[in-house]
Amino acid sequence: MADDPAMASSNPISDDSLANAYTQIFQILEKHNIPATFALVGLFAGAYEQYVDSRGDLLESEPHRNWLQVPERSFAAGLHDGWFYPELVDQIKSRGNHEIASHSFTHLPLHNEGVTEESFFTEMKFINQWKQINSIELSTFIYPRNQIKFENGLSDFNFVGYRQCDIQNSAYTNRFRILQDECNIGRKSDAHSLSTKPVAIPPGTFLNWRHGPRRVIPKWVTLKRWSNVLDHAVASGGVAHLWLHPHNLITARGQVELFGDAIARVAKTQKSGLIETVPQAEYCKEIAQQAQPRNHE
């Protein structure tokens, strides 16, 4: 949403609504004892003052300067509400069982016009600074808008995996095809990743955002679709990887309940001993271990 012109004058997301959305996510995950990966945009998971400190260097990059036009207009108008969440890192760390991953530093889509490998390195430089400030390790990466590029360079910055992209979550997919996929109650789980460096984590299943045209999709269809993914993972030994955007809980009616019901289905399957729930970094570690040659006596 960082490039939505409306954000410069009327941000639909406030500090309070953002904090409430994350509180609800934490409560649902804790209720069912489910670990998760939280992929954060470093710039906005910090304070406005930290943005001011990095602003000069960022705006020297033309792709970043173009990308940050909307936030710049918002901040120039004195509108900071809903943009920054500096408490989030500590809130995640305090839970003890969740992973913090990187969702870039500025959310710059790497397929934007003018984006080069130097732009990618600029992102990585600021990500490194951000993780040092917050005393965290970052092991996995989720590309902004799922636009994958320069993935071979991630290992140079100690990333062991990144989330792959499929038709469902591609930025270029026709909206009608997306709606078709959201209504596909026969959706299957993903096959396991190969042991590559970095690991291409299965793209997973997006939890329908009940907003705009998507809100016509009944809740039962979304839950049936997700249940089928879980059942197929159990039957085939595949991967059931659910993901969403936290701001979806703010901008869509009934999204909190939908997320809670989807996680309850995960918990039920886990309690039956049929699946194991792990964050992305642990999944990549398991894939790497499985690929190691075994000693035979």
Model-found features: residue ranges?
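Catalytic alpha-helical scaffold of carbohydrate-active enzymes acting on polysaccharides/glycoconjugates
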Residues: M1-V199, W220-L242, L249-E297
